[in-house]
Regions:
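Accessory substrate-recognition/RNA-binding modules or partner subunits associated with SAM-dependent
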Residues: 2-140, 144-149, 155-161, 168-169, ...
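Glycine-rich nucleotide cofactor-binding entry segment
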Residues: 154-157, 170-180
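Amphipathic alpha-helical repeat scaffolds
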Residues: 274, 305-313
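Nucleotide donor/acceptor-binding cores
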Residues: 89-92, 192, 301
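Generic beta-strand/beta-sheet core signal
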Residues: 154, 197, 261, 287-289, ...
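A short acidic, Gly/Pro-enriched loop at the edge of an enzyme's catalytic core
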Residues: 292-304
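Conserved S-adenosyl-L-methionine
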Residues: 174-295
Length: 385
């Protein structure tokens, strides 16, 4: 049975995801705002779960219909063939987002969908499934925008940035899916040396090592679709074959040196724990030191980092805020000087503060706007002369 899928991603990373899904040879890939769609069998969605590095979720579309009011939303949802997917023994939860809709409360919209699903299953099966908001077998996703409802099933279960590899984190860690997008959009070559001078908990270095060794991002975790009744049998055998093929692609070592550096003890502890959990101790070298003191370790390579944005946490425009601004400017000046010492290298930086770009004083060959959660940031790439 051919169905529609929609892979969500961080705003601004749609191009990276589209190229990724096309490289996976998924049928009829089409870009959209906030994600990328494709069509195919359930196995195609499973392949996206296993291999897509930049996708946040993989949604299987069950239906799309006009929903100008709550009654239309209920009836349209109830008309879908839920009994083809769920049984009375499976659990469910509904998540909703509403945009420019007559129904303005997402929780109420989710409740109407839940009512429609359980009423349909009670009618068709004689029993109703239970709701489990914390750990459901089926995650149902409603997107209600401008009077049109799209109802989907979430194949992943937990979001795809949860690779099953991170055990420790630092303040405001970068999500793995966004880190993968930074590497893809920045054109980071796994065959060249890689250094993250402000590695934090190591997300960029770990994602780079996974790419370099061709380790599929979904190999170490479970997915929601594995709990679906339709998974047992054909899809389960196909999934086992997919994972076996993915393991056969793994390289024994990364082809070039990978260095993750940080100054702070808590970050270094998280870095060591996460690299060990990922099984990448032989691939990633951990260094302790100030990023501003880094010197080139080879004639060329990639400096890739996500420096602190220096968001102003203090209210107002008082002396404390101005002092903070001066400290941030001084810090970025030191980072810029470090980058400029790396002649022959390529710097790829995810920056949330224009002070860094001003300090470097080179025109970036890439300046790509994207979003880190609610924050607008820029992916900057410089070739250091």
């Amino acid at each position: 049975m051919t169905v529609r899928f929609f892979d969500t991603c961080a705003k601004g990373t749609e191009g990276a995801l589209r190229r990724e899904l096309a490289a996976l040879k998924l049928p009829r890939v089409r870009g959209d705002r906030g994600g990328v769609g494709f069509e195919g069998e359930l196995a195609h969605g499973m392949r996206a779960c296993l291999h897509a590095r930049t996708a946040m979720r993989v949604l299987l579309e069950l239906g799309r219909f006009p929903a100008p009011d709550q009654d239309a939303l209920y009836e349209g949802t109830r008309a879908l063939a839920w009994e083809d997917w769920l049984t009375a023994r499976t659990t469910l939860a509904v998540e909703a987002s509403v945009v420019s809709s007559a129904i303005t409360h997402s929780g109420y919209a989710a409740l109407k969908v839940k009512d429609a699903v359980v009423d349909r299953l009670r009618e068709k099966l004689g029993e109703r499934p239970d709701v489990d908001p914390k750990d459901p077998d089926f995650g149902i996703v409603l997107h209600l925008a401008r009077g049109e409802a799209t109802v989907s099933l979430d194949l992943a279960g937990e979001p795809l940035h949860r690779r099953g590899l991170r055990t420790a984190s630092t303040i405001a860690p970068l999500k793995e899916t966004l880190a993968a997008a930074v590497l893809a959009l920045g054109g980071v070559d796994p065959a060249l040396p890689f250094v993250d001078p402000m590695a934090g908990s190591g997300t960029l270095a770990i994602e780079h090592a996974l790419r370099a060794r061709r380790i599929a991002p979904g190999l170490s975790r479970a997915f929601g679709f594995q709990r679906w009744p339709v998974y047992r049998g054909g899809p389960q055998s196909e999934w086992d074959r997919m994972k076996e093929a993915a393991r056969a692609e793994i390289l024994p070592r990364a082809p070039a040196p990978i260095v993750a550096r940080d100054l702070h003890p808590k970050a270094l502890a998280a870095l060591r724990a996460n690299i060990a959990r990922a099984g990448l101790e032989a691939d990633v070298t951990i260094e302790e030191g100030d990023a501003r003191e880094l010197v080139p370790s080879s004639p060329g390579g990639f400096l890739v980092t996500n420096p602190p944005y220096g968001e102003r946490l203090l209210a107002g425009e008082g002396a404390a805020a101005r002092t903070q601004d001066r400290k941030i400017a001084g810090f970025y000046k030191g980072i810029a000087e470090m980058l400029l010492r790396h002649s022959g290298w390529t710097a790829v930086v995810l920056s949330g503060n224009p002070a860094l770009s001003r300090a470097v004083r080179l025109r970036p060959e890439i300046d790509h706007r994207l979003w880190n959660g609610p924050l607008e940031v820029h992916l900057l790439r410089w070739r250091i002369p």
